[in-house]
């Protein structure tokens, strides 16, 4: 629900939304950087306490946005943004010819997996690897990467509820 609400808001404001779906925060950071996106947005719901989850904003360099920016975004969402001696209006909706589009960006996730595989200094050929994905965001990346590095990979807890 959060994913599609965010997509609706972005596209209604004239922006395109590239979806990686369930994935890891490092993959969003990597794709934001290498594919030259203005930013990356990660909706997180992890093993962390609830107050550490929510929306993570990543800049075009693949880094977490500075705290000052995050606070401005939070104030804007709360309707309390007052900067440069003025209140900021709601984001305008795009005109029909400028509505953004949603792109299922599996290519991005695959590129990230290729990057991880390219880092493989060691061969895992003949090595048995057990992965507990904890039903989390790495479930659709981890096995593919270890398999590509030659491991005999066994995975448990790779059924996240999304």
Predicted segments with their positions:
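Ferredoxin-reductase
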Residues: 1-61
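Gly/Ser/Thr-enriched, mixed-charge loops and adjacent short helices
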Residues: 53-162
């Amino acid at each position: 629900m959060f994913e599609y609400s965010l997509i609706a808001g972005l596209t209604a404001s004239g922006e395109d939304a590239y979806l990686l779906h369930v994935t890891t925060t490092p993959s969003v950071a990597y794709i934001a950087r290498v594919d030259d996106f203005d930013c990356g947005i990660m909706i997180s719901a992890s093993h962390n306490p609830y107050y550490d989850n929510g929306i993570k904003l990543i800049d075009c360099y693949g880094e977490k946005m500075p705290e000052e920016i995050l606070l401005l975004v939070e104030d804007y969402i709360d309707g309390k943004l007052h900067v440069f001696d003025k209140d900021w209006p709601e984001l305008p909706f795009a005109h029909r010819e400028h509505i953004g589009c949603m792109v299922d960006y599996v290519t991005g996730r695959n590129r990230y997996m290729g990057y991880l595989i390219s880092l493989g200094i060691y061969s895992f050929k003949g090595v048995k690897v057990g992965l507990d994905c904890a039903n989390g965001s790495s479930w659709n990346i981890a096995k593919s990467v270890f398999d590509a590095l030659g491991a005999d990979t066994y995975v448990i807890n790779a059924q996240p509820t999304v």
